[in-house]
């Protein structure tokens, strides 16, 4: 979609190649945030991607189908956070992903922690875990996909993510955000679910000593959410009305105007 480029806030006012814009499928696309020009996020992105403290990082295991979604939040996350590696696939094996292997090598040697962010029975509260262990390097592992895809990926890769004999690799969960869902780009299956970017930012807010880290990471997501409300009547309705979690999953999806894992488009 073409928009008024002069009104985009930190972006150029023409569509020439020199201005950082390209043409993708007939739409003008920003060369920095890779979003359509009239949905540009650049004025909410940090000048340089945020770097975490030495020895710390984020690994996102992304379902292949998630790359196709226009409102996937991980591409926005990687624009804001420099210390983030994205591995695409359904099944991951030891010895095939260097960044994953290095994180678990350090954990086996007892010099670092691995926190696998996946809620449910058996997950420990991240804030309590951080308070109980000495400060040392860590890696946060998150799964990116629809709720069903994430469930299947965790089950398939559980032996790799939580290997026997590595107590410093553990499954953790976040405390529900105050006020419930903050930016429901999708119709969540139950209260407390968040987008991948929200979950990672919230976890980093617990793991890091920097009090402004979480809001800095979430700024471009808030911009994306605000822009999309203007394009999507169903998203605007969900934001204004909230989501009723009392009905069946099907009733919630119909009421929310979503498919439980799809995206509203701009």
Region spans (language model):
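Short cysteine/histidine-rich metal-coordination sites, predominantly Zn2+-binding motifs
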Residues: 44-57
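Short hydrophobic beta-strand segments
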Residues: 57-67, 113-118
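Short cysteine-rich clusters marking metal-coordination/redox-active sites
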Residues: 30-33
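Cys/His-rich microdomains that often coordinate metals
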Residues: 37-40
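S-adenosyl-L-methionine/SAH cofactor-binding core of RNA-modifying enzymes
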Residues: 82-165
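C-terminal folded domains that constitute the principal catalytic or ligand-binding module
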Residues: 133, 139, 147-266
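Short, flexible, mixed-charge glycine/proline-rich loop motifs
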Residues: 17-25
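Histidine-anchored nucleotide/phosphate-binding helix
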Residues: 43, 69-80
């Amino acid at each position: 979609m073409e928009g008024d480029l002069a009104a985009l806030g930190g972006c150029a006012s023409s569509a020439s190649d020199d201005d950082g814009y390209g043409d993708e499928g007939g739409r003008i696309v920003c060369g920095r945030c890779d979003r359509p020009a009239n949905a540009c996020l650049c004025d909410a992105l940090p000048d340089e991607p945020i770097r975490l403290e030495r020895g710390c990082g984020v690994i996102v295991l992304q379902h292949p189908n998630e790359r196709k979604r226009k409102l996937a939040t991980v591409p926005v996350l990687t624009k804001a956070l420099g210390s983030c590696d994205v591995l695409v696939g359904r099944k991951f094996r030891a010895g095939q992903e260097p960044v994953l292997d290095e994180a678990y090598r350090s954990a086996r040697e007892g010099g670092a922690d691995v926190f696998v962010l996946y809620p449910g029975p058996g997950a420990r509260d991240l804030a309590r875990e951080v308070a109980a262990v000495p400060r040392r390097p860590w890696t946060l592992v998150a799964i990116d996909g629809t709720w069903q895809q994430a469930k299947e990926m965790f089950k398939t890769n559980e032996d790799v993510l939580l290997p026997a004999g590595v107590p410093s690799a553990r499954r953790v969960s976040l405390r529900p955000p105050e006020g419930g869902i903050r930016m429901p780009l999708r119709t969540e299956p139950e209260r407390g679910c968040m987008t991948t970017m929200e979950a990672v930012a919230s976890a980093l807010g617990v793991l890091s000593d920097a009090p402004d880290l979480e809001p800095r990471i979430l700024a471009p997501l808030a911009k994306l959410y605000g822009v999309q409300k203007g394009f999507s009547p169903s998203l605007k309705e969900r934001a204004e009305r909230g989501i009723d979690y009392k009905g069946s999953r099907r009733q919630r999806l119909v009421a929310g105007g979503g498919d439980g894992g799809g995206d509203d488009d701009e």
